[in-house]
Curated annotation (Swiss-Prot):
Sequence ranges assigned to domain PPIase FKBP-type in this UniProt record: 158-243
EC assignment: 5.2.1.8
Source lineage: Bacteria, Pseudomonadati, Pseudomonadota, Gammaproteobacteria, Lysobacterales
Function: Involved in protein export. Acts as a chaperone by maintaining the newly synthesized protein in an open conformation. Functions as a peptidyl-prolyl cis-trans isomerase.
Keywords: Cell cycle, Cell division, Chaperone, Cytoplasm, Isomerase, Rotamase
Reactions listed under catalytic activity: [protein]-peptidylproline (omega=180) = [protein]-peptidylproline (omega=0)
EC class: isomerase
One example of a Gene Ontology biological process annotation: protein transport
Native species: Stenotrophomonas maltophilia (strain R551-3)
Protein name: Trigger factor
Keyword presence, Cell inner membrane: no
Length: 431
C-alpha cells in the first residue's frame, strides 16, 4: 500500500491513503454470505434466504462495519510504513481522490533527544507506621461513631453547639426578622474564629454580641469588607460521647470475634496501603517536577494539550456538581485556564512513555497482580473484584497503564541522583 505523508507543523503530519476496494468488496460479500447461512427470517428456510433479501436487510450495516475495519487497518499500515509514533486520536477526513480515499491528520511524539535521567535530582521519602498512628486511627473511628449528650455547663472546644445568630450592619439587620439557626462543633473552624471563641463558656440560653470582620469577597454584599455586630445565642450545648473499644465496637468493623489484636492488625494493613499510595504519589510528583524542569523547552502536541485541558475542566466541573454546587453556564474558552497544567501533564506522560520505549521496559505481571489484589483487598468480596478486572478490558487497561507508569517512575528514581528523607506517617499521607 502506498501512503503519502506531508508535514503540516512541527508535530503534525498528514497521511493520504486509499482503501483497497477489492478487499472491501470481498469482505462485504463474505460477511453477507455468513449471515445468509446462519440468519433466520420468517418465510424462508435456514440457509435459503435470497441474497437480495440479505442485502436489503443487512447490506448497509455490513458495509459500514467493513469500511470502519478496513479504514483502521489501512491507517495502521500507513503509520507503520512511515514509522510514525503518533499521540492522541487521528482526525480522518474524506480525500479528494475518489470514494475510498482518506486523509488522516495526526500528531507525533516530540523529539526529546537523549533522555539522561541520571542528571535528575529526586527526594525519596519513606515512613513507618507506629502504634501511635494505629491509636490515632482507632480514635478517629470512635469519633465517627460518637453521639451527643446535652449538658448544662458552658461550651468548650469539641462540643456541639446549636446557635441562633443575627447581624447588625449599620441600619440593616440580617435577617430582617427572626434568627439564623445552625450547629457547629467548636474548635474545628466551622465559623469565624471570633464567633467560635465568643461561644466558648456560653451555656444554654446565654447570648453575646461580637464585632466580626467580614472579608472583602464575602458572599453577602452588605457584610463584605465590614466590621459587623453579630449576636449569638446558644440554644443547646452537647458534649461528645464516644463508644468504648469493646467487642461490639470491633465487630461492627467486620472483625470476627471482636479480637482487639486482629482489629489493630487490620488497621495497620489499611494504613500500609494508604502509605504505599501516598509515597508513590509523592515520588510521582518529585519525578514529574524534575522532568518538567529539564524538558520545559520541548514543544508539546497542541491538539493533545487542548484535549487534556478540556478533560481537566470536565473533571473539575463534575467534582463541583458532585458537591451539590451549581456550575452555571461554562464559557467556551474556560479550558484555556487549564492549558499550562495540561501541557505539563502531557509532557510527563510522553516522557514516561519514551523512557519505557527506549529502555525496553515491560509491564511486570507480578506487580500488576499485586496491585490488583491490593485494590481488591479493600472490598468485602476481593475475588469478585479481581474477576471483574480480568473480564473488563477497559478496566484492566487502565490498571495496566497505572502500574506501568509506576514502574517507570521507580526506574527513573533509582537511576537519578536522590536523597532520602524520612517522614512521619501523618506527614507522608498529607498531600
Amino acid at each position: 500500500m502506498q501512503a503519502s505523508i506531508e508535514s503540516t507543523g512541527n508535530l503534525e503530519r498528514r497521511l493520504s491513503f486509499s482503501l483497497p476496494e477489492d478487499r472491501l468488496q470481498s469482505h462485504i460479500v463474505g460477511r453477507l454470505g455468513e449471515i445468509a447461512r446462519t440468519t433466520r427470517i420468517k418465510g424462508f428456510r435456514p440457509g435459503k434466504v435470497p441474497a437480495k433479501v440479505i442485502e436489503q436487510r443487512f447490506g448497509a450495516q455490513v458495509r459500514g462495519e467493513a469500511l470502519d475495519g478496513l479504514l483502521r487497518e489501512t491507517f495502521d499500515a500507513a503509520v507503520r510504513e512511515h514509522d510514525l509514533r503518533i499521540v492522541g486520536s487521528p482526525r480522518i477526513d474524506k480525500g479528494e481522490e475518489g470514494e475510498f480515499s482518506f486523509v488522516a491528520t495526526v500528531e507525533v511524539v516530540p523529539d526529546f533527544g537523549d533522555i539522561d535521567v541520571s542528571k535528575l535530582t529526586v527526594v525519596r521519602h519513606s515512613a513507618e507506621i507506629s502504634d501511635a498512628d494505629i491509636d490515632q486511627m482507632i480514635e478517629n473511628l470512635q469519633n465517627q461513631r460518637r453521639t451527643w449528650a446535652p449538658v448544662s455547663r458552658g461550651a468548650q472546644d469539641g462540643d456541639l453547639v446549636a446557635v441562633e445568630t443575627w447581624s447588625q450592619a449599620g441600619e440593616e439587620r440580617l435577617p430582617a426578622e427572626g434568627t439564623e439557626k445552625g450547629s457547629i462543633v467548636l474548635g474545628q473552624g466551622m465559623m469565624f474564629e471570633t464567633i467560635e471563641k465568643g461561644l466558648v463558656g456560653l451555656a444554654k440560653g446565654e447570648e453575646k454580641t461580637l464585632d466580626v470582620e467580614f472579608p472583602a469577597d464575602w458572599r453577602v454584599p452588605v457584610l463584605a469588607g465590614k466590621t459587623v455586630q453579630v449576636t449569638v445565642k446558644v440554644a443547646e450545648v452537647s458534649e461528645p460521647v464516644v463508644p468504648a473499644v469493646d467487642e461490639a465496637f470491633i465487630k461492627s468493623f467486620g472483625v470476627k470475634g471482636g479480637d482487639v489484636e486482629q482489629f489493630r492488625s487490620d488497621i495497620r494493613a489499611n494504613l500500609e496501603r494508604e502509605l504505599k499510595g501516598a509515597l508513590m504519589n509523592r515520588l510521582r510528583r518529585e519525578v514529574g517536577e524534575q522532568l518538567i524542569a529539564a524538558y520545559a523547552s520541548v514543544e508539546m502536541p497542541p491538539r493533545l494539550v487542548e484535549n487534556e485541558a478540556r478533560a481537566m475542566l470536565a473533571q473539575q466541573v463534575e467534582q463541583i456538581r458532585r458537591n451539590g454546587q451549581n456550575v452555571g453556564e461554562i464559557p467556551a474558552d474556560a479550558h484555556e485556564g487549564f492549558k499550562d497544567a495540561a501541557a505539563k501533564r502531557v509532557l510527563v506522560g510522553l516522557l514516561v512513555g519514551e523512557v519505557a520505549r527506549v529502555n525496553d521496559l515491560r509491564l511486570e505481571a507480578k506487580r500488576l497482580n499485586e496491585t490488583m489484589r491490593l485494590i481488591a483487598s479493600t472490598y468485602e468480596e476481593p475475588e469478585q473484584v479481581i474477576e471483574m478486572y480480568r473480564n473488563d478490558p477497559q478496566l484492566m487497561s487502565g490498571l495496566q497503564n497505572r502500574v506501568m507508569e509506576e514502574q517507570v517512575i521507580d526506574w527513573i528514581a533509582e537511576r537519578a541522583q536522590h536523597t532520602e528523607e524520612k517522614l512521619s506517617f501523618q506527614d507522608a499521607i498529607r498531600q
